Amino acid sequence: MNINRHDFYERYQKGELKIALIGMSNVGKSYTATRLAEHYEFSLIEVDKLIRTDMGHESMKDFAEWQGQPFTNGYAEREEISIEKETIATKSAISSKKSNTLIDTTGSVIYVKEDVLEELVNNFYVVYIQVHEDHIERLKNDYFSNPKPLIWNNHYRKINTKSPIESLFACYPELLEARRKAYENIADKIISSSKILDKKTDINELFKLLQPAD
């Protein structure tokens, strides 16, 4: 949704501002969303939680274990189910009538059904939190130390000289690059994760970072 700074403030004052945060898992979306909800009274909707509730998973770890890795049996079918569930959850979040809605999307929001993604883009101010190059290694490590379900969308391939896990690490930058392009295509605003995660960035500065340039 293309809006200027005046529209941004006016919608916020009326309780009609709609923001969607997009980007990779562990890049700082939930951290940002929680801070904004606490200090600026946004109505936060966490799509991950909607999906977990629908599927009966108690934690993100349970969800990740159910989905598995792209080299495990049945992954393709479970990946398809995940996208279907995410489409339903994202549609539900978009339909919210709450004041100043803030959607914390999943990293795979770009794979939901086209009509739902289009509805999100047309009705929400989309903020993309882009992975700073200094954070890429941390994201890879977080993926294994703090598992989250990840849609690989055919970007994983087994490398002959590497184990399946080593192949995941090797293919991760390719997945990041493919997603970067997809995120940028739907973003109204791009913010570096270096700004989002910087402890010196206070909540007021964070709110300003979100706003349109003009």
Where are these regions (language model features)?
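Hydrophobic anchor at the beta1->P-loop junction of P-loop NTPases
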Residues: 21
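Walker A/P-loop
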Residues: 30
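A glycine- and Lys/Arg-enriched "phosphate-lid" helix/loop adjacent to the NTP-binding pocket
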Residues: 122-178
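ATP-dependent small-molecule kinase phosphotransfer cores
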Residues: 50-118
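Short glycine-rich anion-binding loops that position phosphate/pyrophosphate groups of nucleotides
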Residues: 106-110, 132-134, 196
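NTP-dependent small-molecule kinase module
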Residues: 1-16, 35, 39, 100, ...
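Walker A (P-loop) phosphate-binding loop of P-loop NTPases
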Residues: 26
